[in-house]
């Protein structure tokens, strides 16, 4: 499979995987995507080290679909990877920090015929693509981004500090002081599709201050069908035709798997 995919390369490091029909998806650099202050390339310095430099970073890549026969590839939407912020350290070194409020892209597939859904983020905008690279529908919800509450901003700072414990205190404090807090959260926190083609878009449930996980549901025609509210914080494992399989952490730090039946 690697040799078959190599003929469509070179591929970039990003989200990739198999789809239910045996297709594969991956990402490639696309010169038609404009460069910007955040979508900037890595540059090799005098020491042979490669870096995109300090500041907010979101490197955009084109998603490609490769057919089950591995004989054709189709370009589709854009994947933005993990948002990061680069800080310059001593001796020309750099540290890249991921803020908990930074956005990431989500990809899901399902339906008959199968479709690929891409939420690039941070806006509430999901593109639905056919398996032959045709953009069939765009689902948008203006003004969907939320402002993070003060208690979540404090938690985010504590989390980032815990991820930088390998640094000495002075360096860690200086790095954290330079990482800005996003003024709003990414609109899409999760994405899934059922075997029958309904699209599920998570918009709440990823912050401790959220009392429940909220998923908007859209029909195969793109129409809004309603929202699903599941109390507490959970991770969606699978969306079936008539059920949701979720996993959540219990108070004693164990994992609990639950199934919820869907009523149409």
Regions found by a protein language model. Give the residues of each.
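Eukaryotic scaffold repeat domains enriched in small/polar residues
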Residues: 1-264
């Amino acid at each position: 499979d690697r040799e078959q995919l190599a003929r469509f390369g070179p591929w970039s490091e990003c989200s990739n995987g198999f789809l239910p029909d045996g297709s594969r998806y991956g990402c490639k650099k696309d010169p038609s995507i404009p460069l910007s202050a955040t979508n900037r390339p890595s540059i090799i310095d005098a020491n042979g080290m490669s870096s995109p430099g300090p500041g907010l970073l979101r490197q955009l890549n084109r998603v490609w679909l490769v057919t089950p026969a591995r004989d054709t590839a189709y370009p589709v939407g854009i994947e933005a990877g993990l948002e990061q912020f680069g800080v310059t350290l001593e001796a020309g070194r750099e540290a890249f920090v991921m803020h908990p409020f930074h956005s990431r892209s989500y990809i899901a597939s399902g339906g008959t015929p199968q479709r690929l859904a891409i939420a690039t983020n941070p806006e509430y905008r999901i593109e639905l693509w056919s398996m032959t690279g045709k953009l069939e529908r765009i689902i948008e919800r203006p003004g969907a981004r939320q402002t993070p509450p003060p208690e979540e901003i404090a938690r985010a700072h504590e989390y980032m500090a815990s991820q930088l414990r390998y640094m000495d205190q002075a360096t860690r404090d200086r790095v954290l002081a330079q990482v800005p807090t996003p003024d709003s959260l990414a609109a899409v926190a999760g994405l899934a599709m059922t075997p029958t083609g309904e699209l599920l878009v998570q918009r709440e449930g990823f912050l401790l201050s959220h009392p429940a996980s909220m998923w908007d549901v859209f029909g195969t025609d793109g129409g809004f069908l309603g929202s699903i509210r599941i109390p507490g914080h959970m991770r969606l494992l699978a969306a079936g035709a008539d059920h949701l399989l979720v996993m959540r952490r219990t108070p004693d730090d164990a994992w609990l798997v639950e199934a919820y039946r869907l009523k149409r």
